[in-house]
Amino acid sequence: MGVKLKDIIQPEQIDFKDLKGRAISIDAFNTLYQFLSTIRQRDGRPLSDSNGNITSHLSGILYRNSSMIEKDIKPIYVFDGTPSYLKQETIDQRRQTREESEKKWKEALAKQDTQEARKYAMRSSKLSPYIIESSKKLLTMMGIPYIEAYGEGEAQAAYLVENGDAWAVASQDYDCLLFGAKRVVRNLAINSNLGDLEYYNLKRVLDELDINREQLIDMGILIGTDFSEGLKGVGAKTALKLAKKGELENKLAKLQEESSHDISEVREIFLNHNVNTNYKIRWKKPAKNDIIDFLCEEHGFSQDRVSKACDKLKNLNSSQKSLEDWF
């Protein structure tokens, strides 16, 4: 998912203590997919309650956020809105991949090949209206604010950083940098196997590559984005060489000849995305009893574990601090 920039940008390693007291805008869809993909049983089956409702995402939301809040990290979730029509091809491709993976997952289950089953199960994850709405419901009970983006959640999350409402964006996708996020944190997981936290400062990234943001966006378009296919044979390293030689425009012109849509529209999505500016951010006192009723009574969670997780939410108390106190 997203633009493949890993080969040309180097992260800084940071620790959770470096995020203490910080507000972090979290790409909700990206994070929910992560929960649904990784929080599964050995054979790839997602966690579910007695009625067959998936609960992997609820487990992830409760335990990851309670651990972050215990470390004095303040999450703000950002949910995607209506996708651009330019993203439809990517959406269709992902749907096809999920369907094919689900078929292979079931075949592996029939063969009792748990390793293969889990591999394909992770690729079959999808966000249903139930998963999205139940996630918002739990976040509200936990006192964690969320914002509805008009379009791409990554663009909205980047805007929160630009506007001073969050310190960094948390997402696995490098697209956040193209959307102008000043700071990006990857692998924001507690006790996961995703590896160490990775931190990217946009200004430092651009300085080290000796390019500007507009060039980074054009490089992304040549590599390929969620909104358009790239130019065949052009990866991150080749795109960077083209930028250094001043040949981006020539290659973009060639790509435009092959493309069915106006590439300038893709550039505009990254440079001037329509964002929601009418929002309020407030962390509230968690509703512990409601959380226990929702997770334990409705979805069969362990009351002891849920209660302990709720106790970690004590930093979100009724005496609300101002945003400035978190920076």
Curated annotation (Swiss-Prot):
Residues annotated for Mg(2+) 2 binding in this entry: 173, 175, 226
InterPro entries assigned: 5-3_exonuclease_C_sf, Flap_endonuc, Flap_endonuc_arc, HhH2, PIN-like_dom_sf, XPG-I_dom, XPG/Rad2, XPG_CS
The keyword DNA damage appears for this protein: yes
Chain intervals for the UniProt region annotation (Interaction with PCNA): 319-327
Domain of life of the organism encoding this protein: Archaea
Cofactor stoichiometry and binding remark: Binds 2 magnesium ions per subunit. They probably participate in the reaction catalyzed by the enzyme. May bind an additional third magnesium ion after substrate binding.
Cofactor: Mg(2+)
Region (I-domain): 116-246
Alphabetical list of PROSITE patterns matching this protein: XPG_1
Annotated EC: 3.1.-.-
Annotated GO MF terms: 5'-3' exonuclease activity; 5'-flap endonuclease activity; DNA binding; magnesium ion binding
Keywords attached to this entry: DNA damage, DNA repair, DNA replication, Endonuclease, Exonuclease, Hydrolase, Magnesium, Metal-binding, Nuclease
Binding-site residues, Mg(2+) 1: 27, 80, 152, 154
Family according to the record: Belongs to the XPG/RAD2 endonuclease family. FEN1 subfamily.
HAMAP family: Fen
Functional description taken from the UniProt entry: Structure-specific nuclease with 5'-flap endonuclease and 5'-3' exonuclease activities involved in DNA replication and repair. During DNA replication, cleaves the 5'-overhanging flap structure that is generated by displacement synthesis when DNA polymerase encounters the 5'-end of a downstream Okazaki fragment. Binds the unpaired 3'-DNA end and kinks the DNA to facilitate 5' cleavage specificity. Cleaves one nucleotide into the double-stranded DNA from the junction in flap DNA, leaving a nick for ligation. Also involved in the base excision repair (BER) pathway.
Protein name (database record): Flap endonuclease 1
Gene symbol of the encoding locus: fen
